[in-house]
Structures are given as C-alpha cells and as structure tokens.
Amino acid sequence: MKVNERGIFMKNHQININSQKCIGCQMCIKDCPAKNIELQQTKASIIDNECIMCGHCVAICPKNAVSISGYDEEPILKQSNYQLNPEDVLNTIRFRRTIRQFQKKDINQDILENILEAGRLTHTAKNAQDVTLIVLDKEKDKLEKMAVSLFKKIKPIDNLISSMAKRNEITDYFFFFEAPKVILVASKDHINAALAAQNMEFVAEAYGLGVLYSGFFTMAANHSRQIKKQLDLPKGQKLVTALVMGYPKVQYQRSAPREKSNIKYM
C-alpha cells in the first residue's frame, strides 16, 4: 500500500503512456490537475508517480494511449453523447419524499448492485476513494435491535425536552420501518460519503424504490460500542448515513411546500 504525503490512497497504481499510440496532442497535459505530464520529443510523458490518480489523462486521450495499472476493470468507451433532461431531474428532486412505509417486497440483487455501483463511481475529494458501503440484510434486524435498546434508555430524557419525542414510541422497527435493505455509508470525509449516498438514492429512485436517511440509526451506531464492533469499519472511518430502502407502500400526489432559498449573488 502506497500513500503519498497528502494521505491519498494509491494502492500501487502507476500511470503508463504508450508512446506508439500517443500523437502529442497535449490534451492530457492541459487537463492534468497535478501538472504531472509534460511533452518530451513530441510525446506525453509522466513526470513522476506522485499524483492523485484521478484518471483524467486516461479518460481524455483520443487514442487510448494512457492507462493506470492496478485496477480489475478496463475503462468503458463512451459510445455516444447523452444528456439528462433538466426538467426530469428537477422533478425527481421536487417529488422525492422520505419513505417510512414499505412493501413486503425484496430488492432484486442486480438492482441492488447497480445502486451500489453508483456509490462506488461517485467522485471523492482528492480521489481518495475512501467510502465504505455496508449492506444490511441478514444482520439488519440484529443491529436494529441493538439501536432500539440504546434509544429506549435515552427516550425518557428526550421526553422532558421534546413533545414530539413523547408522541413517538420506540418500536422494534423504529429505525428501518421493516424495509428489506439498508445501505450504511461510512468515510473519514462526510462530504464524500454524502455524495455517494445521494448518487445511490438517484439510482434507487430510477428503479422505483423509496429511501429514508436514518439519522437516528447513524446516531445510535456512532455511540454504541456493540454496533461499532459489528460494523468493523476501517480505521478512522465513521458512519455518516444509513439509506433505508425498499418499494414504497404509498404514492404521493403532489410536491410538498418548501421555504424560499437564501440565495446571494456576489
């Protein structure tokens, strides 16, 4: 395992440029955020291996002359231009609701893997690729039971300061609402984890699934030694969010009202 001075996980990757294929167009040189490529005798050449391995040089090369070692898969060629319909994307956000009522229907494994793929492909700061995804399936009820036990102990305190807490009973399904799957998202960087979670939700929505972000379970997991031990996260990582996921039992008829944004142009 190789880590540079900025702590970027590099895992023995190396950039290679095929001089036979390179046409010296300099597209990789202009696009490299690390300024790690130069032109030598009309061919692109790597200065050293200390970069974030973002792969922009691989993606932009018109002749497929650049590669990065150490990956299990080959880059996918973009066959044609595609564009999302802006109004469709906005409506997906507009009509998206947090789901707390789920059908008793499991999620197909192929669908689940595509959702997880969205998390894997999500961009991360400095290309850290430091997001851990945990799918709760067989252990879901066990972990929820641990979290319920913890919350039942602290509920009397919450009741003293919140009328809403008084109205909410801590049931056996208080956290996951009997949803078939839960995806836990952990990282050292909260933004990296949040971006992965959001992308996974978009793919889940495309498959007709509904999602709840369980802040309560996240809170319980980060305060429970038992749950931490069960999750066995990589050193330094923390659970950032939990995507409770399944097919909605209810259909919403319209958008919900929202306050105006606090937007400033400068």
Q: Can you name each region flagged by the protein language model?
A:
Residues 2-266:
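Acidic, surface-exposed loops and disordered segments
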